[in-house]
Curated annotation (Swiss-Prot):
Leader sequence segment: 1-15
Family: Belongs to the torovirinae spike protein family.
Residues on Intravirion side: 1203-1220
Domain of life of the organism encoding this protein: Viruses
Lineage of the organism: Viruses, Riboviria, Orthornavirae, Pisuviricota, Pisoniviricetes
Species the sequence originates in: White bream virus (isolate Blicca bjoerkna L./Germany/DF24/00) (WBV)
Virion surface domain ranges by topology: 16-1181
Membrane topology type: Single-pass type I membrane protein
Glycosylation (residues): 60, 80, 111, 262, 403, 601, 644, 711, 774, 789, 1004, 1028, 1091, 1121, 1143
Subunit structure: Homotrimer.
UniProt-recorded name of the protein: Spike glycoprotein
């Protein structure tokens, strides 16, 4: 199989090679690093894990950049491309901090060859720098000395501690340059040399067109990698610290560290160069939520700065000329082959959570098989992370198949059918055309992701050599045709020295992918698999700075312009990045619990290794020349040196190692956390580009089309269906004892005759009960369907502009206030009907309030009727279980008798030890009878199991329906009411502003809740949550019930230690807004106040104020049924009572009352659906639907109740008599 894979890969790679260049691929540069004069800012970065933990790190970098463009090298016949340093794409806009480093820097030319640690052969003794001549090679040295660094809290705007070393630490940078002076200043000074001299240097070799020296000052990192979560079940599976990245194993810190700590992190998570497709091939269950991935992100940022500081020291060695013979025969370079072997060796030794041994992998796979064609999807319906899910499943099956633990795997058998005879991926309509970039390479990547883990080490080494022969690598190049996921990059485990990180990782989570290509769909036996460079996050999500992305994710395009939320740091650890000389180095590692500290000692350096320097490039090597001491510690700001600075260690590992390039030493903090994280995604909108919708007082509200599901140009409908899809079905022969057990066998009939005579009456009663049960289920389904017909989310037409009309089923009341809880204030209303004129409102207002109050009681009857119906079905189920039990017990007794009798015959047969034909035939008969009896008993047990399943299904359905009604009562269209797919059908952003006044926001892709309109502050706020009967609270502060005050909450966390003023001062709820209607001067409101007084305001004038009488009490229990006529009488009494108190006469609204009565009569014959009409008619129809549903429920409930009562009285007597 591995040989087939290699051949397929060769053909694919060859096909890619042949499209633009018959020889080797062409390197291209896609990194656009960018113009900023000087970067000397301390950057705090906070990475949240959505619990009370966070990873925080800070970087500091100083470099004399200018706005010039720096051309890339021209190598042989390859293309010449340029790049521009663009720090806006790398660093987020966070306020600059005070200088983190107390740094002193000097820059000189080394005139003594003995003092230059690089190869003396390239050194030329010269005069001072001011008199540099042409075509000479020089050794430059920069020395940076630092004494301390601050840990700075940007929210509190003060230092929280600083890192202190007893002795000054010095970092020296050496550089060898062969220069050709161009436009040399006539009399440059030493300070001018910093900005002019190096920019004027040009090399005479053919590879380098421009070389700029940029000194690197170092990084300071604080992070906590002690916790991780499994991708398979992140909510309740916590990976222990031993599965986190560990640097204290009893191994030497050798080659794995030569390209920064990200290789260790990548080895733990089985991440590959680009960090994408091979996620599917790793056998570890750690993924994006693990600290290893955070280390990967942090090291990516560090390495980017390192690469910008020294842009050409990561591509050592020579390259093949543009000829196929060189590519295939000489290979790329042996250095990289050895490096890969070291990585592979280290990877084999690491502790990795094995997918095969973890049952959570099955849970993860099943969890993502929620849809028919995709395992998951985005909010917009596109496939989500299908490649990860599918490949994990396929990898598990394939590995089990190759290990012999599975005899066959259909998925593995399907793999060869995905290609044609040449190994190319077969064309499908939803695939990119074959001439485009990634088409074939995607399949090769997929194929290798499946089979690469099954290779032997010898096969992997052979395959790696093959890849090295046909693939081209260079810093800044992606691969053939800029395909991001070239098999060369993904499979070969290339070091970061040869392949850059993709721009998506350099700018984590803050930008759209810049690769230019979306994922491709590959149809497989279990669904469409997305393979490509857009890789959403599995697990429960990740927060970076103030942006949180959860599953399923939504693309977010914005610049983060505010600092991280308030956090508290206990600075108990530090990671220091320093330059280490290329020599023998002693190290000591002390551990205490999960913390560790590594000290390097270069006081006795070995002879430096001679580095081969190609003529086509210059090499800058960093050298750290001062010994680190074991007494480096973290000293809290403003406290004495011994506070929080002493550590006891219980384990020590020491040794020596041989390093070539940078080494990162890590010391983990033992405590780092965020207080009370708040769930949710908060997007800062650019409100200047939004449409102003309305103004209330001094506040302007804006409309954001990306935050609403309302579409005013078309009528949409959401179907909510709670029907039971299947009835209980049984083979009719089950109810005929002898035919079911014996068919036509006379011997069997004889044996079971007496048994069937006893059990046949019970089976007849059971059959009758089943038929009644199925009829009851049909009635129950019909009832629920009738009720759900009233819960549809419709749009009605009142003006040429359509608007959203939400149906209230039921129009219930909140738990805390005796009034509807679905509206809090203007601009935050869940559903606000727009009414035409103030006159119309004045005539209809009292009637609206009266009917709304009465319907609350009717709704309670509806709820109780549903509960009563459910209680009846529970009783029916219990009756069936009661009568099945004697049947089962009888079968068990018969089975025991047959067993006992068979045993007696066998014992007698053994004792006599005489074989006779007659006895043998008799025993065979008994065995046959016994087998048939057991089969029959099994059928009955299946019936019982089916009943149990149905009862669970009915209970689940009832619970879901109850939850849906409850959610609708609070104006939340929850997953209990509607599927994600249905919700997506109406989630079509509209460019037509219209009268949109409902903002919907998605939480985890399914539940919809309603949000405020955008205010001039530019922040979306969820509706305030009631926490008692008289107050409400805004979400940017949190209420402390102990102190009665509020404390600060950011986008991700709250800080209980800081007391602030509440966003909204506690005040009584003024009113509930029923409607908004326009006036020439603005907006008027129709409200019900909290003291149950109905008011109509025109401007600031109260037109009328009427007290609302208490509604009548409607009761509906299992023994008392409220008839529809009684409910109508009570409703009419309520209307009459209100008419006596209103300021309007009956004649003024008689036409409305007449129309209302006609609608009531029509509702008795059918359930009315919405259609075009006036707003007032639509409101009446809401009421009519509810009344009609009450009629249907009461009638059906009465019928079911009577039938149950009859069943309760008759069935037990019949069964008991027959059993006797």
């Amino acid at each position: 199989m591995w040989l087939i894979t290699i051949l397929a890969t060769i053909s694919c790679v060859t096909a890619q090679l042949s499209q633009t260049n018959p020889d080797c691929p062409i390197p291209t540069c896609t990194i656009l690093p960018p113009p900023k004069t000087t970067l000397d800012n301390t950057k705090f970065r906070v990475v949240y894990t959505k619990d009370q933990e966070a990873l925080i790190y800070a970087t500091n970098f100083t470099s004399p950049f200018n706005n010039a463009q720096y051309p890339l090298p021209t190598l042989g016949n390859h293309l010449n491309r340029s790049y521009t340093l663009n720090y806006d794409k790398v660093f987020l806009n966070i306020a600059d901090s005070p200088d983190m480093l107390n740094l002193k820097t000097s820059w000189t030319v080394v005139n003594n060859s003995n003092l230059c640690p690089l190869s003396p052969s390239v050194y030329r003794s010269t005069s001072p720098l001011q008199t540099l001549t042409t075509a000479e090679q020089y050794c430059f040295m920069t020395t940076a000395t630092l004494t301390s660094a601050f840990l700075y809290d940007y929210t509190a705007m003060k230092p929280v501690g600083y890192i202190r070393a007893r002795a000054e630490e010095t970092i020296s940078f050496f550089s060898i340059m062969k220069t050709n002076m161009v436009n040399r200043p006539t009399s440059p000074s030493l300070s001018q040399a910093h900005t002019h001299t190096l920019a004027a240097m040009r090399t005479t070799a053919t590879g380098i067109q421009a070389q700029t020296f940029k000194p690197q000052t170092g990084f300071f990192i604080v992070l906590d990698a002690s916790r991780a979560r499994a991708v398979t079940n992140p909510l309740d599976t916590a990976i222990q610290p031993k599965f986190s990245p560990s640097f204290i194993k009893e191994v030497t810190f050798d080659h794995i560290f030569q390209t920064t700590i990200n290789e260790t992190a990548r080895s733990v998570t089985r991440e590959t160069t680009t960090g994408y497709i091979m996620n599917a091939a790793k056998t570890g269950a750690l993924y994006k939520a693990s600290p290893a991935y955070y280390l990967f992100l942090i090291s990516s940022d560090c390495r980017l700065q390192q690469a910008l500081s020294v842009p050409y020291d990561f591509s050592l060695g020579r390259f093949c000329p543009a000829s196929m013979s060189c590519c295939l025969n000489k290979g790329y370079e042996q250095y990289y082959v050895n490096t890969w072997l070291f990585h592979y060796y280290n990877l084999k030794r690491l502790n990795v959570l094995n997918l095969e041994s973890s049952p959570v992998s099955d849970h993860f796979i099943q969890l993502h098989r929620t849809f028919n064609t995709e395992h998951s999807m985005h909010c917009d319906g596109s496939p989500y992370a299908s490649d990860t899910t599918y490949n994990i499943a396929l990898l598990r099956d394939t590995v089990q198949f190759l290990n012999g633990t599975k005899t066959t795997t259909p998925l593995a058998n399907e793999i060869p059918q995905l290609t044609d005879s040449l190994g190319y991926l077969k064309y499908q309509p939803d695939m990119v055309d074959a001439s485009d970039h990634q088409n074939y390479m995607a399949y090769v990547t997929y194929l290798m992701a499946i089979f690469y883990p099954t290779f032997t080490e010898a096969q992997k080494f052979e395959f790696h050599n093959l890849l090295q022969s046909v693939c081209y690598f260079d810093k800044g190049s992606i691969s053939r045709n800029q395909a991001y996921h070239s098999i060369c990059h993904i499979i070969s485990f290339q070091t970061t020295a040869s392949v850059p990180y993709p721009i998506e990782l350099q700018i984590p989570f803050t930008t759209e992918p810049t690769s230019g290509y979306n994922a491709y769909l590959v149809k497989t036996p279990i669904g469409s698999v997305a393979i490509g460079n857009q890789n959403p996050f599995d697990g429960e999500g990740v927060c970076f700075l103030t942006t949180c992305i959860y599953h399923p994710t939504k693309k977010i395009n914005q610049k983060l312009t505010i600092p991280p939320v308030r956090w508290q740091v206990v600075p108990e650890g530090i990671a220091v990045v320093t330059g280490i000389p290329p020599n023998c180095l002693g190290y000591e590692t002390y551990t205490q619990g999960s913390s560790f500290f590594t000290i390097y000692n270069d006081s006795k350096p070995c002879q430096p290794q001679t580095m081969q320097i190609a003529q086509a490039r210059s090499v800058i090597t960093t050298v750290y020349s001062a010994a680190q001491k074991s007494d480096i510690f973290v000293q809290p700001y403003g406290k004495s040196s011994w506070v929080n600075g002493s550590y006891q260690f219980d384990q020590f590992v020491g040794g020596a190692l041989n390093l070539r390039t940078l080494t990162f030493t890590m010391r983990k903090p033992t405590q780092l956390y965020v207080l009370d994280p708040i769930e949710g995604t908060y997007i800062i909108p650019d409100y200047q580009t939004k449409f102003p919708l309305l103004t209330s007082g001094t506040q302007t509200y804006y409309y954001d089309p990306d935050q609403t599901v309302t579409n005013t140009t078309e009528v949409s409908k959401v179907t909510i269906d709670f029907s039971i899809r299947t009835m209980i079905t049984l083979d009719p022969l089950v109810f005929n004892c002898e035919e079911f057990i014996c068919d036509k066998d006379p011997t069997c009939r004889t044996q079971f005759s007496s048994y069937c005579q006893t059990t046949q009456p019970i089976l007849a009663a059971l059959k009758d009960a089943f038929e009644k049960y199925n009829r009851s289920i049909a009635d129950y389904t019909s009832t629920i369907r009738a009720l759900t017909n009233t819960t549809q989310d419709l749009f009605a037409s009142a003006t040429p502009v359509r608007y959203r009309r939400g149906v209230e089923v039921p129009l219930g009341y909140g738990h805390d206030l005796e009034q509807p809880s679905w509206v809090y204030d203007l601009g935050g209303t869940a559903i606000v009907p727009w009414i035409g004129t103030a006159v119309a409102v004045g005539k209809l207002a009292n009637r609206v309030a009266s009917i709304e109050a009465t319907l609350y009681q009717i709704t309670q009857g509806v709820k109780q009727s549903i509960q009563s119906t459910n209680d009846k079905f529970d009783k029916i189920t219990n009756i069936l279980h009661t009568h099945l039990r004697p049947v089962t017990e009888g079968l068990v007794r018969t089975n025991e008798q047959l067993n006992a009798f068979s045993k007696q015959v066998r014992d007698q047969f053994t004792m006599i030890n005489t074989v006779t034909t007659e006895l043998s035939a008799y025993v065979d008969q008994l065995q046959q009878v016994f087998t048939v009896g057991a089969f029959y008993q099994n059928q009955i047990l299946q019936v019982i199991s089916q009943l149990n399943s149905l009862q669970v299904y009915v209970d689940t359905l009832t619970s879901s329906f109850t939850d849906c009604i409850s959610d609708l009562n609070q104006k939340i269209l929850s997953p209990a009411c509607i599927t994600t797919h249905q919700l997506l059908q109406i989630n079509k952003p509209s460019d037509n502003l219209g009268l949109k006044n409902v903002l919907t926001h998605y939480i985890n892709g399914s539940a919809a809740t309603f949000y405020h309109l955008t205010s001039t502050k530019g922040v979306y706020k969820p509706l305030p949550k009631l926490f008692n009967n008289t107050h409400f609270l805004a979400p940017t502060t949190a209420y402390n019930p102990v102190t009665g005050t509020c404390f600060f909450c950011g986008s991700n966390a709250c800080d209980k230690s800081v007391t602030v003023d509440c966003d909204y001062q506690p005040q009584p709820l003024q009113s509930t807004i029923l409607a908004v209607y326009p006036t020439p001067t603005g907006l008027d409101l129709l409200t019900i106040t909290s003291n149950k007084t109905f008011e109509i305001k025109h401007g600031s004038t109260v037109v009328t104020s009427v007290a609302i009488p208490p509604p009548p009490i409607l009761s509906s229990t299992i023994n008392i049924n409220v008839t529809f006529q009684q409910q109508l009488l009570q409703l009419q009494e309520q209307v009459d009572q209100l008419n006596l108190q209103t300021n309007y006469t009956t004649t003024e609204i008689q036409s409305i009352i007449d129309k209302y009565n006609v609608e009531i009569q029509n509702a008795l014959n059918q359930i009315v659906d919405f259609g075009p009409g006036t707003p007032s008619l639509a409101l009446w129809k809401v009421i009519l639907i509810l009344i009609a549903v009450v009629v249907v429920i009461v009638i059906i409930a009465t019928t079911i109740f009577c039938s149950v009562r009859k069943n309760q009285s008759e069935l037990p007597l019949q069964v008991l008599s027959r059993l006797r």
